[in-house]
């Protein structure tokens, strides 16, 4: 898989925003993210440019994605950061030690992407062959070989707990995320309306301390086998 490098220089940001406004046919963007931090452009320059767009009325709020604690603090010192988007789920819990405390301290909303483990935590994927030949997930370590088998065992236990709770595995996974903090707003992706409704049902799932402890025992930090991204990333 080929991944394009992030760009955060002023010229690129301004060009991208203008193009987005034209494409969407709107006067402003509610929340504009810098998706991945550009290693070649100081974060202060990137956020400073985004702040100018706020003053111009083209952008209302600024967000970052996959930024580390130092970058978050430096960015927030230039202009208030409204949201940080980073992967977080029952099988990707790396943010808990350093990222979540910082965003909570600074009053920044946290937006977990891939809250359902790229679909794995839904219980709908039972074998590698369930993934279409052109599916990007085939390149991800957690969906390959022995990692897949081990992760399937983890999901099986989540499915059992969800069945006892009377909800879908996806709803249990999302409810767990929502229980981690009031500033957390997960963004599960889907192409189907019935899945949207199912995901929204997570708002009606309340987890007790005992249930949260049970989930913790099933999927503690580091429980997932394999890395988050392909080695090329």
Which sequence ranges carry the predicted segments?
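Glycine-enriched alpha-helix->loop->beta-strand junction motifs that scaffold or abut catalytic
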Residues: 76-83, 104-111, 182-184
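Glycine/proline-rich, positively charged
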Residues: 1-94, 98
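Conserved, mostly hydrophobic/aromatic
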Residues: 20, 29, 42, 62, ...
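Short, hinge-like loop/turn segments at secondary-structure boundaries
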Residues: 6, 78-82, 100-104, 126-131, ...
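Terminal-tail/helix-coil boundary detector
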Residues: 105, 133-164, 179, 183-184, ...
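Aromatic-lined glycan-binding groove of carbohydrate-active enzymes
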Residues: 95-133, 168
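Proline-centered loop/turn at the N-terminus of a beta-strand
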Residues: 60-61, 109, 168, 185
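Glycine-rich beta-alpha junction loops
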Residues: 68, 88-92, 114-121, 176, ...
């Amino acid at each position: 898989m080929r991944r394009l490098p992030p760009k955060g220089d002023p010229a690129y940001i301004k060009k991208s925003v203008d193009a987005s406004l034209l494409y969407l046919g709107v006067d402003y963007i509610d929340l504009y993210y810098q998706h991945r931090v550009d290693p070649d452009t100081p974060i202060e320059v990137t956020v400073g440019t985004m702040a100018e767009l706020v003053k111009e009325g083209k952008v209302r709020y600024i967000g970052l994605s996959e930024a580390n604690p130092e970058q978050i603090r430096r960015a927030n010192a230039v202009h208030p950061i409204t949201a940080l988007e980073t992967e977080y789920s029952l099988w990707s819990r790396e943010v808990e030690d350093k990222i979540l405390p910082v965003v909570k301290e600074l009053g920044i909303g946290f937006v977990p992407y891939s809250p359902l483990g790229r679909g794995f935590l839904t219980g709908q994927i039972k074998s590698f062959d369930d993934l279409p030949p052109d599916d990007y997930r085939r390149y991800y370590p957690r969906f390959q070989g022995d990692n897949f088998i081990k992760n399937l065992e983890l999901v099986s236990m989540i499915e059992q707990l969800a069945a006892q709770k009377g909800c879908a595995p996806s709803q249990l996974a999302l409810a767990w995320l929502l229980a981690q903090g009031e500033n957390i707003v997960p963004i599960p992706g889907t192409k189907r309306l019935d899945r949207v409704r199912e995901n929204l049902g997570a708002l009606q799932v309340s987890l007790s301390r005992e249930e949260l402890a049970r989930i913790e025992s099933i999927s503690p930090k580091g429980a997932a086998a394999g890395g988050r991204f392909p080695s090329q990333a």
